[in-house]
Amino acid sequence: MDVAALVSGGVDSSVVVHRLCEEGYKPAIFYIRIGMEDKDGYIDCPAEEDIELTTLIARRYGCPFEVVDLHKEYWERVVSYTVETVRRGLTPNPDMMCNKLIKFGCFEERWGYQFDRIATGHYATTDLLNGKTYLSTAKDPVKDQTDFLAQINFAQISKLMFPIGHLLKSEVRAIANAAGLPSAKRKDSQGICFLGKIDYNDFIERYLGKKEGRIIELETGKVIGRHQGYWFHTIGQRKGLGLSGGPWFVVKKDIKRNIILVSRGYDPDAQYGKTIEMETFDFITEDAYEAGYWNREDATPVTFKIRHTPEFTRGLLYKGEKGYRLESEERIQGIAPGQYCVIYDEDHHLCYGSGMITKGR
C-alpha cells in the first residue's frame, strides 16, 4: 500500500513517520508550504526550520521527500474566506477550511491521488461501521482535533490515516524522545496557521482598515467607549476592549452601524444561549436522516462543540424545512454566527459533521 505522510516538522507528524516505518510502510513525505509570503513582505510560519527538520526525518528513515507549494491556492481559498467572513461580521474557522480545501483538497488533486492512503499528525481516529469509515475522537481528549476535521467529506475520511490518534500527547513525546527524533523537544504550534508570528489584528487591519465606532452597554444603551472597527471583535470576547470597570464581554455586533454591544459581569445572561440555528449541515460519512439512522420527525440526542475545547455539551438536534436547530441542555457562552457547530454521538465518540451557525439565542 502506498502512503503519503503530510509532515510539518513538528513532533506529532515526525512520530507519524516513525510509526509508519515501524509498521513496514515507506511513506512518501510531503511538506505543504502555504503561508504569508506576498509582495508586501509578510513571512510564513518558520517554514525553513520546518523543512530542515522534515528533511532530517526523511533522511533518517530513507523516505522520499518533496516540498509542495500551495501558497496561491491557500490565499485564494482560505485567506480570502477568512477576510470576507470577518468583513461580514462573522467568526471564521480557517483551520477547518485548510483541512477541507488544502490538505485534503488541493493536495489530493495534485499529488495525493497517486497514493492509497494519506497519513497526518492529527489527533483523531476512524471507525468502520456498516462498511463505511467514520471520523472518531482521539484517545487524548485535550488534544483531540476532530472539530478541525468536521468539514471533510466521505472520500477524504475514507483515505486518511491517523497513526497517533490512539496515543496521548505525553506518549507521543515519549516515543519521539526514545527514538531520538530531532523534533522531540519542539513546542507545539499555536494560533492560525497562516499568520505565523503576525498579530491577528494587524493582519485584519491590513485588509479591512480601521473605522471608529461606539461601544455601547447592552442593558443601558450608554456609550462607554470607542472601537476601531467591528471586525476586530468577536462574540464572547473579553480582552482588548480597553474598558475600565469590567470585566466586559462582547455580546452583540451591529454591523450596519458599526456598533459593539457589551455587557458587564462574569456571566451575564446576555452572553449565553441555548439554541443554535444552522441553515445547512454537512455530514462527513452519510446523511443520517437519509440513511434512516435518525428520524426527522424526532429530536436526536447528540453532543456538540462550538469552539475548540475538550468539553462536550449535550443537546437535541432537530431538522426542519428551513434548516437545523440544536437545543442545548445547558446555557453556552458566545454562540458566534460564522463559526461551526460540530455534532457527535451521545458518547462523544463518532463525529457526524458540522454546520455553520447562522443564529444563536
Swiss-Prot record:
Localization of this protein: Cytoplasm
Pfam families found in the cross-reference section: tRNA_Me_trans, tRNA_Me_trans_C, tRNA_Me_trans_M
Keyword Ubl conjugation: no
Any single GO CC term annotated in Swiss-Prot or TrEMBL for this entry: cytoplasm
UniProt protein name: tRNA-specific 2-thiouridylase MnmA
BP GO terms, sorted: tRNA modification
Interaction with tRNA: annotated span: 143-145
Family membership: Belongs to the MnmA/TRMU family.
KW tRNA processing (keyword) present: yes
InterPro entries reported in the protein's UniProt record: MnmA-like, MnmA-like_C, MnmA-like_central, MnmA-like_central_sf, Rossmann-like_a/b/a_fold, tRNA_2-thiouridylase_MnmA
Domain of life: Bacteria
Main localization, broad class: cytoplasm
Active site residues per record: 98 (nucleophile), 193 (cysteine persulfide intermediate)
Listed Gene3D superfamilies: Adenine nucleotide alpha hydrolases-like domains, HUPs, Translation factors
Organism: Porphyromonas gingivalis (strain ATCC BAA-308 / W83)
